[in-house]
């Protein structure tokens, strides 16, 4: 959502691409900020992570389409294992319908940062 809703980091990604610099992505499975202190099974996450497998797969595919060589999944063991499972299952390239879905979803959430932030 940070890139799709707030254009966060696109300048850095472009500069890295132009200079052949590898990028490690953080928070690619972040959904939004918590609205309450009830974090259920995600006690280790300061943000609400994606939990739907298909949504996570699209988020990972989108992330890896942005000149990113790797990413760090959330600190939740189940989500960490799911991310590894997904990347080990021959991820296909993200398609236009999936990008549209992610853009539509990003309109309705409170992302974990904004385009003005320097540190998240």
Regions found by a protein language model. Give the residues of each.
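Beta/alpha (TIM)-barrel catalytic core signal, keyed to glycine-rich beta->alpha loops juxtaposed to Asp/Glu
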Residues: 1-120
